[in-house]
């Protein structure tokens, strides 16, 4: 499809696609198109905008999944090149607020393509990174960066800053011993970028359209897109009930803990802000864009959460509310940010970002406020079933991160709750090449108030039917009702088979369609180890010897000779700590040589057969690319 247009046009379209795809999941949906036209302030009547969006969705959404993929986006432009609709669409894209167009420097753009990115995001992310990594000796050669220049896009080029930011968002994701830090060469830089991208994927970032070369060249829209995902994961990490029980203070009358657990981090943040605004006697807000533009809600929020000096060792911080009555919106925003600075929270937004209602940066600003000063007390006297707050298991987190890394929409925050209408599962079927009849068999949101659950249940029934009839999964005793109920064991059984098939498909594509199963992988592993003169071998994915990670480390060294520093590898009689050290090194090294491993070090130490299988399968995929 893309072959009919020039490389330059294709690159330009990729930029445009990135501007419309607000949540960065690789697809455009109708509400993103609405937001685009709203932001662009084009002189078009409302009915005309609706007509254009309807036409774009009709023309572009070839597989009728209510989303436009990049390929579909390209075909729209080919089909609508000269029409009024295409012109309006292009105007909307080019007028999107806060977009800075720069002449590109890559080969694709040498003919004058414009790369576009948000200056506001660059400014915000640079300041956040400068603060976060200020005392890291490994980043001294890059920091502090000037937020008003392109320093950021150069700074990420060797992969070190990206690796460090990933570890700040999800500690211990990357074993520091595997980051190349000294005397960097093009090869060792490539390894760092592999490590960063594969680790970002493992924590749930959608990196399908980003390659190491894009980062080395510092392509602004791709760098900012990846950084936002990494930063957001870190900001949202504790906005979750099992990690922060005081959030139960946000329960409303008649609600259970389960109701609260279904909310996304964004929804919880909004509820948190409104909880404090209500206590201040101020009207509630419905978003972090339009409703905060006048800064008044922020003034009240800061005043509510500022430490009152009533706890041991707590210093009182007084918020000066005099700026609240300032007539000028911009000056009022600046007064408010001066107060946020007293709390050490002047991050992500400038006064202009507040006044313009930049949704992404205001969300980050509020998330940072929550993390520093939640000002919530865990309710003690209410009849709350705290037993529900177990938090997700490692396996559940791995599955969730795998789904999100593939760009499913909506983003999966809670594994069971977010799969109850099966839309994510149906998207995963498409990823494993099982066709989905989006037109005739799938109900899509918004669901009707009456009978909403029936519509979701129909989707779940269809998902199970596809698994049995088209994917040939083993789904004995699993029905649509189980997915709809969020039954953990049965939902996991289906999700595991989806992930397993996805992993095996990658291998079969590399091996010219030859069928792959566990025995084929074990055989390949042992043959590769033996040919490289290694003494380790595995009998199956339950083999207790795997707990030392020596077979994994040897296999990595067999695939990429001399990549493993054996001085760092513990041998002999190993304690659990030694095994974990080896496993951390093995998982990061696998990612560094180019294997997209989702499993965690603990999975190797405990020899979890499913996750162990994915590790060896991913390494086999990397080894087959070498052959």
Curated annotation (Swiss-Prot):
The keyword Methyltransferase does not apply. One of its GO terms (molecular function) is calcium ion binding. The keyword Phosphoprotein applies. Residues 105-378 are annotated as: Actin-binding 1. Residues 119-235, 263-374, 393-503, 515-624 form the Calponin-homology (CH) domain. Disruption phenotype: Morpholino knockdown of the protein causes severe dysplasia of craniofacial skeletal elements. Gross morphologic abnormalities are observed in the knockdown zebrafish larvae, including deformation of muscle tissue. Actin-bundling protein. This is Plastin-3. The lineage of its organism: Eukaryota, Metazoa, Chordata, Craniata, Vertebrata.
């Amino acid at each position: 499809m893309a072959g009919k247009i020039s490389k330059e046009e294709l690159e330009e379209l990729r930029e445009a696609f990135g501007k419309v795809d607000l949540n960065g999941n690789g697809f455009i949906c109708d509400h993103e198109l609405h937001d685009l036209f709203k932001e662009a302030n084009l002189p078009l009547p409302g009915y005309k905008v609706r007509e254009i969006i309807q036409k774009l969705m009709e023309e572009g959404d070839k597989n009728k999944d209510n989303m436009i993929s990049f390929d579909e986006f390209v075909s729209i432009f080919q089909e609508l090149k000269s029409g009024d609709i295409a012109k309006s669409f292009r105007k909307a894209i080019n007028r999107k607020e806060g977009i800075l167009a720069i002449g590109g420097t890559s080969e694709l753009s040498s003919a004058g393509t414009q790369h576009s990115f948000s200056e506001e995001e660059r400014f915000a992310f640079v300041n956040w990174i400068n603060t976060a990594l200020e005392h890291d000796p490994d980043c001294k050669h890059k920091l502090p960066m000037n937020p008003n220049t392109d320093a950021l896009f150069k700074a990420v080029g060797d992969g070190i800053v990206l690796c460090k930011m990933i570890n700040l968002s999800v500690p211990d994701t990357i074993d520091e011993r595997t980051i190349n830090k000294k005397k960097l060469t093009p090869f060792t830089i490539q390894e760092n970028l592999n490590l960063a991208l594969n680790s970002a994927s493992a924590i749930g970032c959608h990196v399908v359209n980003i390659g190491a070369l894009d980062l080395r060249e510092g392509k602004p829209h791709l760098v900012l897109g990846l950084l936002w995902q990494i930063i957001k994961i870190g900001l949202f990490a504790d906005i979750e009930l099992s990690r922060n029980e005081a959030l139960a203070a946000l329960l409303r009358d008649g609600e259970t803990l389960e109701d609260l657990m279904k909310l996304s981090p964004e929804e919880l943040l909004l509820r948190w802000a409104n909880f404090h605004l209500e206590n201040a006697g101020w009207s509630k807000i419905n978003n972090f864009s339009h409703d905060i533009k006048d800064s008044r809600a922020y003034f009240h929020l800061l005043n509510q959460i500022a430490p009152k000096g009533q706890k041991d060792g707590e210093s009182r911080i007084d918020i000066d509310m005099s700026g609240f009555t300032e007539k000028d919106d911009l000056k009022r925003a600046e007064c408010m940010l001066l107060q946020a600075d007293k709390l050490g929270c002047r991050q992500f937004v400038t006064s202009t970002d507040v006044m313009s209602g930049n949704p992404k940066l205001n969300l980050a600003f509020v998330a940072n406020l929550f993390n520093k000063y939640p000002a919530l007390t865990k309710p003690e006297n209410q009849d709350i079933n705290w037993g529900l707050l177990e938090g997700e298991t490692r396996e559940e987190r791995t599955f969730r991160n795998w789904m999100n890394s593939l760009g499913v929409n909506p983003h999966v925050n809670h594994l069971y709750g977010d799969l109850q209408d099966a839309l994510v599962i149906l998207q995963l079927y498409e990823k494993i090449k099982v066709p989905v009849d989006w037109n005739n068999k799938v109900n899509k949101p918004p669901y009707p108030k009456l009978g909403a659950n029936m519509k979701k249940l129909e989707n779940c029934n269809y998902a199970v039917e596809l698994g049995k009839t088209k994917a040939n999964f083993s789904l004995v005793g699993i029905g649509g009702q189980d997915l709809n109920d969020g039954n953990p064991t049965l939902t996991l059984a289906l999700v595991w088979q989806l992930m397993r098939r996805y992993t095996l498909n990658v291998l079969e594509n590399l091996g010219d369609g030859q069928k792959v199963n566990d025995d084929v992988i074990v055989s390949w592993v042992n043959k590769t180890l033996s040919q490289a003169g290694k003494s380790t071998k595995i009998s199956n994915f339950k083999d207790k010897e795997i707990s030392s990670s020596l077979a994994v480390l040897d296999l990595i060294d067999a695939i990429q000779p001399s990549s493993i520093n054996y001085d760092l590898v513990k041998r002999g009689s190993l304690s659990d700590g030694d095994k974990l050290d080896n496993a951390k090194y093995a998982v990061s090294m696998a990612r560094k040589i180019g294997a997209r491993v989702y499993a965690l070090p603990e999975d190797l130490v405990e020899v979890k057969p499913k996750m162990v299988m994915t590790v060896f399968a991913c390494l086999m995929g990397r080894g087959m690319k070498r052959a």
